[in-house]
UniProtKB/Swiss-Prot annotation:
GO BP, sorted A to Z: defense response to bacterium; innate immune response
Organism field: Nyctimystes infrafrenatus
Subcellular location(s) of the protein: Secreted
Superkingdom: Eukaryota
Family to which this protein belongs: Belongs to the frog skin active peptide (FSAP) family. Frenatin subfamily.
Keywords: Amphibian defense peptide, Antibiotic, Antimicrobial, Immunity, Innate immunity, Secreted
Protein name according to UniProt: Frenatin-4
Cellular component GO terms, alphabetical: extracellular region
Task of the protein: Very weak antimicrobial peptide since it does not show activity below 100 ug/ml against Bacillus cereus, Escherichia coli, Leuconostoc mesenteroides, Micrococcus luteus, Pastewella haemolytica, Staphylococcus aureus, Streptococcus faecalis and Streptococcus uberis.
């Protein structure tokens, strides 16, 4: 559903943000 997609999008965004901060 829409909320599942939204949750996944937020999760992916958070992971990308963490990775960019770590620089790895």
């Amino acid at each position: 559903g829409f909320l599942d997609k939204l949750k996944k999008g937020a999760s992916d965004f958070a992971n990308a943000l963490v990775n960019s901060i770590k620089g790895t």
